[in-house]
């Protein structure tokens, strides 16, 4: 039973990958819109976009790490049954 709970926890931790994909899409969309509105700030906007990508990918890299920790490193303590 506890093994199943660990699998559910690891699966829930990887949902953050979907959130990271949405975040990267938002960063790219905002970058394109800002360059379209003000082309003279394209270099500055590109720098901010790269920073946004890096921060979003940092969150995305934590998700598989947490899933690995939940599924294989955290030990299961079996409860002793009375009787």
From Swiss-Prot:
This is ATP synthase subunit 9, mitochondrial. SUPFAM superfamilies: F1F0 ATP synthase subunit C. The record marks 57 as: Reversibly protonated during proton transport. GO terms for molecular function: ATP binding; lipid binding; proton transmembrane transporter activity. GO terms for biological process: proton motive force-driven ATP synthesis. Belongs to the ATPase C chain family. The chain crosses the membrane at residues 8-28, 45-72. InterPro entries: ATP_synth_F0_csu (IPR000454), ATP_synth_F0_csu_DDCD_BS (IPR020537), ATP_synth_F0_csu_sf (IPR038662), ATPase_proteolipid_c-like_dom (IPR002379), F/V-ATP_Csub_sf (IPR035921). GO terms for cellular component: mitochondrial membrane; proton-transporting ATP synthase complex; proton-transporting two-sector ATPase complex, proton-transporting domain. It comes from Helianthus annuus. Pfam families: ATP-synt_C. F-type ATPases have 2 components, CF(1) - the catalytic core - and CF(0) - the membrane proton channel. CF(1) has five subunits: alpha(3), beta(3), gamma(1), delta(1), epsilon(1). CF(0) has three main subunits: a, b and c. This protein is one of the chains of the nonenzymatic membrane component (F0) of mitochondrial ATPase. It is a multi-pass membrane protein. Coiled coil: none annotated. It is found in: Mitochondrion membrane. Its main location: mitochondrion. The gene is ATP9. CDD domains: ATP-synt_Fo_c_ATP5G3. Keywords: ATP-binding, CF(0), Hydrogen ion transport, Ion transport, Lipid-binding, Membrane, Mitochondrion, Nucleotide-binding, Transmembrane, Transmembrane helix, Transport.
């Amino acid at each position: 039973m506890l093994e199943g709970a660990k699998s559910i926890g690891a699966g829930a931790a990887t949902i953050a990958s979907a959130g990271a994909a949405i975040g990267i899409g938002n960063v790219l969309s905002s970058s394109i819109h800002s360059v379209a509105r003000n082309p003279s700030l394209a270099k500055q906007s590109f720098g901010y976009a790269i920073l946004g990508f890096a921060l979003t990918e940092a969150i995305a890299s934590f998700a598989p790490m947490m899933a690995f920790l939940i599924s294989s490193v955290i030990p299961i303590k079996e409860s002793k049954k009375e009787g």
